[in-house]
């Protein structure tokens, strides 16, 4: 039969064949490279088949459709074999192929293929229907979900430190960090009626001198009829809790520069003085006070009634936290979390700049008189004598491990529990002293009155991955073998949740030591084992090429090539010059949001993440000096190139992303989940978050694709069987049924909600409040909003 070579007919066939040929060449060449470094054979085989399809299309043979149908079905079989019926994992393997298959069965396309082949069109239609059926089934049957139901049984727990039901007077509602409210006016039956009650705008936005890492992470506190909150620049606001109207504000006039690694404030602390322990001058000056940490190294006491400085505290209300520090340059020491407040003591820790040099300021923990600001004690984790008080001739220790996340406090035991970070530089540790290693990445229990060590437990030995304890620990009394045990839950970046008796630091849930990958960079070492808690969200298997992802099979192929080029032998693979895949990544499976524990039901709500990072050590050379230049400043971010002056390597730290900027690991990257704390089992786990606000173009309507997004911020839970969480990279506050994880409601936020919400009652009405100000390095929309939600008056 003669081929009709009319211009329009031939052009369409030629373009179709050209597309197939280009796809085939890409898959063949890229796939050959992948096979050469140990990856899957699928891609070069698919490339050869695609080139065969292109040749047949060029020859106008309808048999191309038969061959393409075989490729499509083979791809679906291979995809299910690699990843199961996981919709988001199957999508990049099949999306381009399905769309091209649909193109080929369009009448104006296949009719131009004038050399017939019996049943070719029907074969491709069947292949497309089978592929569509597999994807549809996968879309409604998520293999990553766990679908159980928590017991509703609840026994009222004795409060460790009583808090009025209607209040939220501390960062985690109580200083035990439970993030649980006994309020139940808003409950699982009526939360779908929740409406915006009021919005307050702080006016605090990014300034020209700010670094990229400016973040709005505050959880407000509420005492009586007033809400207290700080902004990214630590401006303090007092709002009417019912209307959201400003009562007063205080501006510490923070002066930042681009070297600050953080510009943020997670919260403030509240103290009410008692006449039996405070002087008459204190009682007259500031009986109720707000304690405000400021990123330049100040701690400020402000009258809770009127916003004026407490004149009897420290230097007319301002305490200099840089006193006796070994390096006082602004931005190197940054208190970003609210301190613990006892009847006598303010327990203050702070953040230090990560990965800058071996001559950084100290991570010392200090106790100050809550009324006067006088230094009562110090615990310098890197000093030979941690409790030694410095003088004008003797400073605190360079590069002591720091505790940057909020701490927890047991008033009955008078113990404060601090989640510790690692000695910086973080990613190479060959020169660390035994003192610097001793308490790094540990839970540290100190007597809050004296600063003396009660006990410590190390969660990562010789930490080379920045696997700090990043979250406020949570204290609760939990039933173990029929007996109530006072425990502490410490979520770690590794995904482990370490559970210890908070009286003595003994493990309640086993955490056996297990072998980990060996082979550190030159001059460094790796410990042979690490502890692995049996209560954990850490990955159940190591990553493989099959876990790589992308928008299409083409960038997925690039991710697979990158994966096989890096060093990766599972969790705790040592940093390397080759580049090491770090999973869980530097953001961790847990971050500063922590977990929420209902002490009555003995259940916990958690929101773990799963986003790999890549660390690559950079040997010293031109442009990468070992000695710190005199004018050197911080990088203003925790990612990218970090100098690590004083050790043999700089380092680059970045998320593991595709050429399109998408995570190279397949979704989910974020979950919401519930734990039964009596059995230590994950009862339910769901993906949380959509790509709506991560798209390259605005999406004015909700996107129904629940992928499971990265997040920063934590959950809260209530006696109404409802949990609330924002945190995700899309701008929503969501409510879930605590018992089974069913999403009950979501409210659109005007900016990123990378904060933990809180709830309270005033004038008989329950409110839920969230900061919606965005997160600079997370890339969410920036703003200055505080948003409150409540039920309409006619809803009960």
UniProtKB/Swiss-Prot annotation:
Record field: catalytic activity: a ubiquinone + D-glucose = D-glucono-1,5-lactone + a ubiquinol
Primary localization: membrane
Cytoplasmic side: 1-10, 59-62, 111-118
Gene Ontology CC: one annotated term: membrane
Localization in the cell: Cell inner membrane
CDD domains: PQQ_mGDH
Documented EC number(s): 1.1.5.2
Recorded family membership: Belongs to the bacterial PQQ dehydrogenase family.
Name used for this protein in its record: Quinoprotein glucose dehydrogenase
Naturally occurring in which organism (per UniProt): Escherichia coli (strain K12)
Gene: gcd
